[in-house]
Amino acid sequence: MVKSLAVERAGSSAIRDLLEITEQPEIVSLAGGLPNPATLPTDAIARAAAAALEDDPLGALQYGPTEGYRPLRRWVAGRHGLAADPHGEEHVLVTSGSQQALELLTRALVDPGGLVALADPAYVGALQALRAAGVDLAAIPADGDGLCVDALADRLATGERPALVYVVANFDNPSGSTLSAERRVALAALADRYGFWIVDDDPYGDLRWHGEAPVPLRELTDRTITLGSASKVLAPGLRVGWAVAPVEVRRAMTTLKQSADLHTSALTQQIVHRTLAEPGFLEGHLVTLRTTYQAQAEHLVGALRTKLGDRMTVPEPDGGMFVWAELLDTTADSAQLLDPAVAAGVAFVPGAAFGVERLHPTRMRLSYATADAASLDLAVDRLAGVIPAP
Amino acid sequence: MVKSLAVERAGSSAIRDLLEITEQPEIVSLAGGLPNPATLPTDAIARAAAAALEDDPLGALQYGPTEGYRPLRRWVAGRHGLAADPHGEEHVLVTSGSQQALELLTRALVDPGGLVALADPAYVGALQALRAAGVDLAAIPADGDGLCVDALADRLATGERPALVYVVANFDNPSGSTLSAERRVALAALADRYGFWIVDDDPYGDLRWHGEAPVPLRELTDRTITLGSASKVLAPGLRVGWAVAPVEVRRAMTTLKQSADLHTSALTQQIVHRTLAEPGFLEGHLVTLRTTYQAQAEHLVGALRTKLGDRMTVPEPDGGMFVWAELLDTTADSAQLLDPAVAAGVAFVPGAAFGVERLHPTRMRLSYATADAASLDLAVDRLAGVIPAP
């Protein structure tokens, strides 16, 4: 009686169990996508909370509109090329993290049994939300330039009709890849031709420390829904994210959000707006984040190449939070390495967790975001003791 | 392409539009269930926010467990008769308002096309969540003692098998009625016999200023899921609620919550825990709330009986936030009175908004929670100018 289809579809809680295990202080976790605690701007958040409750207690504590706090919606619109549009905020829905945005838009745009295309491997949280919604998944291959849009085009040519194509175009989770400019143009053209929606889940785009960002998908086609979040640039515990979408899509999502949770916390929306919109704050904070993550990424990649270079290949990230390492032993199974790794005091996420159709047994996602350099060294030493030498 | 079945089912946004209209300052709104702004404990919340960010910034700002902040879960368990259970918090899921709890448990326990029984009239937010989930609704009559459990028993005897029976057993929204002790016993016995779950949505139980509360349903059968909220006893803008449920149900809801929004804001959970668990705070604040709402209820009922006693009957509430007034003109349609009422500067919610199968045209829900005495007088004067004399 207890488990409905929705619960069954949402699947196991293996990742949640893993993240709980890695909360043990003796384990160095490369598993989660948690910001480095030292980067959390606690003082700015405390000032914003105090100011919101002092200046606008009713706005922070009373029921608010389902669409979100209007100044935050305006700020988000401005960051997404809508600054000149007097009704730009009509494109914006504030959500309880971008996870909720994905869940709402899936339910708003895809009926159960409908089709969603996405890269294989794909973000675990997206897989959970999509599977819980009862949609079918079309797994598209991906490489260092992101989703293989040619392969998607072939599937479309055979008559497959996804309602959505989901991408993390900037610093993909788990693969770290960025969708190339050429593929963005091609993907946008396919969206216009076949009438599907592109969901560009973009929590990491601001965390680029090297190279130029390709043109955003939203500038290439109106059939783009961009998801953003305060989790990686401010603090995940606030649970504030957003969707920027065509107004008709935003309205459909709003209807579902009203029955899902009425609205996102008015207080945390005010905190996010007061910090992110404070002149100079975000630019300065992004410099801190990029510098921190670049240093940690270079440290992790360097240590992995030094101590495990004979056993894995490790790409050099230009941004984001993840390295998608590949074991050179083609018979390896990273899922079977996890228990010994945790026993040795280090955690990662095995490739299988991100599998849509394939298991990615030679892959492991390693996050350099959370741990400092000394902890990263310790983690690599422990990994080296667990991954068999060639 | 934009509107899925889920959006269609979730229905129109008439109530949201109404609540937006009533934000205009020249309108006295008896429409929403918003706490009187004067009762919001802004200082206590500001102190709690500052303390959380000072004492436990990581706990307030980093990702947290999907189940919720453990000290808050323990506190909720203690308020629900589980203080002596060393694992009492395992029964508790913290949610983004009790609205989310209802949505999650519906998806966890009822597949699309399954049956949910509830009183007609019923809470609008419940109707939206249930309809969005695609479940069928069995409308059960209700009277001044709440859901007519005999009528439910008759339906069960004919072979109908609801997966859930939804009640607001204390100070129902919209009817204001409290489910009698006898009916609680009978409902619990039916749950045990037929194996359905009782959802006892209880945001108003603490707002009782007269009489004794009947025994809680959770003490009568283990097949009870109790929903609670900080919205009415603290502040709705925090969006913190909870479900207290058998562990297997709590686990199924947790799986769906993970894909819905990962977890509820860690900061607002800490604020709610630090205020509600502070010795003496809640007891004192509930005295303030009960005194305020009792005075406002008596003021509204008195004014309605004085100025509209020839046109409506008005029950005297013992708690909660709502009066479910009945127009004496049996041909009246409260939905048609709304536009002239808003034009005259007063808003209410017409009975039709709460209809499951019936339209309740002679009914109107009037909230005395938000407005002070002078505004309530103004509202009644304006209503008297709109409701036709006999």
Segment roles from a protein language model:
Chain A
Residues 8-97, 104, 278, 347, ...:
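N-terminal small-domain helix-loop-helix segment of the aminotransferase-like
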Residues 291-301, 313-326:
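Conserved glycine-rich beta-strand-loop-beta hairpin in the small C-terminal domain of fold type I
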Residues 253-258, 278-302, 330:
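Structural signature of PLP-dependent enzymes
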Residues 206, 219-252, 264-267:
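Active-site PLP attachment segment
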Residues 343, 358-390:
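PLP-dependent enzyme catalytic core of the Aspartate aminotransferase-like
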Residues 331-337, 374-378:
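Short, conserved charged micro-motifs
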Residues 59-194, 205-223, 293, 322:
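Conserved core of the PLP fold type I
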Residues 27, 203, 342-365:
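Conserved PLP cofactor-binding pocket of PLP-dependent enzymes
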